[in-house]
């Protein structure tokens, strides 16, 4: 038997119920594509600066009540090197959609999908450390229509070892 757990990426949360469910599964697929590449000073090297698009799709059946979002889709744009002299920084904007599991919370009947609009900028402080201030606007947090929309300001950081 496999432990029932859920996880979201990009600084999201992870939960663990301690329950098991026979035969559960899920999958995700992500696609990234550069749309525009800034010209390189050195013709023999391709510039890493430019605009890219990404798409993420995940699915896990809603046959258990712990899986609150059986379907999730996110799309966005990332520009690397948008600011002059900051060629390793990235500027991001993304839109996410999570479809609420109708069986997830029987006490709350007024639920719907959750939508997230996010924007941020990652500052590459040095070769191994970045800081990323961001803002998110969330419509129907937790898929609950009775909860007011939320705007969240945050700061994430990362290290490469």
What are these regions (language model features)?
Residues 32-36, 78-82, 120-122, 158-160:
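Transmembrane beta-barrel domains of outer membrane proteins
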Residues 149-161:
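Outer-membrane beta-barrel "beta-signal"
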Residues 29, 75-77, 93, 117-119, ...:
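Membrane-embedded beta-strands of outer-membrane beta-barrel proteins
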Residues 1, 51-59, 73-75, 91-99, ...:
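Transmembrane beta-barrel strands of outer-membrane/channel proteins
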């Amino acid at each position: 038997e496999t432990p029932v757990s859920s996880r979201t990426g990009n600084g999201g949360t992870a939960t663990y119920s301690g329950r098991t469910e026979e035969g559960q599964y899920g999958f995700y697929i992500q696609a990234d594509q550069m749309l525009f590449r800034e010209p390189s000073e050195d013709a023999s090297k391709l510039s890493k600066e430019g605009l890219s698009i990404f798409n993420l799709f995940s699915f896990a059946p809603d046959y258990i009540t712990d899986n609150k979002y059986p379907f999730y889709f996110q799309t966005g744009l990332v520009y690397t090197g948008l600011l002059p002299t900051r060629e390793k920084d990235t500027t991001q904007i993304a839109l996410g959609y999570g479809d609420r599991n109708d069986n997830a919370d029987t006490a709350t009947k007024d639920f719907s999908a959750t939508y997230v609009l996010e924007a941020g900028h990652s500052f590459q402080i040095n070769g191994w450390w970045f800081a990323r201030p961001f803002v998110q606007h969330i419509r129907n947090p937790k898929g609950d229509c009775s909860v007011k929309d939320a705007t969240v300001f945050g700061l994430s950081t990362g290290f490469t070892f």
